[in-house]
Amino acid sequence: MTIKNIATKAYTSSATALWGCGLAAVLVLTGCSALPAAPTRPVLYDFGPGPLATVPTDRRAPLAPLALADMDAPGLPEGGNAVLYRLAYADAQQLRPYSQARWSQPPAQLLQQRLREQLGLRRAVLKADDGAAQAREPAQGNKLPLVLRTELEEFSHLFTSPSESAGMVRLRATVVELTPSGESLRGQRVFIVQQPAKSADAAGGVAALAAASSQLAGELAAWVEQVGQ
């Protein structure tokens, strides 16, 4: 074999090797670009920061303490944090979750906190299972505090058309008095509140539900005051 043939063969082998390396690099880069993107984390929502300053003292006489039981949520998936919507114009019987939106806590807990804030503006609010709730009030004729029980039946972003929607909250409230002979019903009422949503998405539904919850809390506090008289 001549020197010329040896050189030609070496050149051909080198070119083939370089071409193979280049092809491998292209395949690696192509494979990397085809990797699935990292999943998007759902956005967490709540009702906002709550009161930002101490509420001025109410000049009216404080109301009797109230025992607030943990809220039940028979109308919602148990323990779920999904932001739910309902298409009343298409399939009103189906609750659907927004895929990229979650509540920071189950809705019943968020609404319970809002109720406690509103009720606490004029009275002490106790936990129904707390020992303090079993203490008799001398100022109230040594009676036990009234007990407020609540059931969240609906908490969804309700669409009546593709462009019209509202945050809807439906809550059943029951006030009972604890007596030596058992519980005595003082009153029961179903509250239904809707607040229009400014946008047809999760953010619009969340804002509408927060506004509806605040309105419901105010209406419920006024009703409980009437029932307790």
Language-model features: locations:
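A structural "domain/chain start" motif
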Residues: 33-109, 227-229
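Bacterial N-terminal signal peptides that target proteins for export
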Residues: 3-22
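Short secondary-structure boundary motifs at beta->alpha junctions and helix caps
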Residues: 93-101, 180-222
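C-terminal motif of bacterial Sec signal peptides marking the signal peptidase cleavage site
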Residues: 29-31
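Soluble periplasmic/extracytoplasmic beta-strand elements of cell-envelope proteins
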Residues: 65-72, 86, 147-151, 168-174, ...
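Hydrophobic helical h-region of N-terminal Sec-dependent signal peptides
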Residues: 23-27
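Surface-exposed short loop/turn segments
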Residues: 34-53, 122-180
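Sec-exported extracytoplasmic/periplasmic mature domains
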Residues: 116, 120-124, 157, 221-228
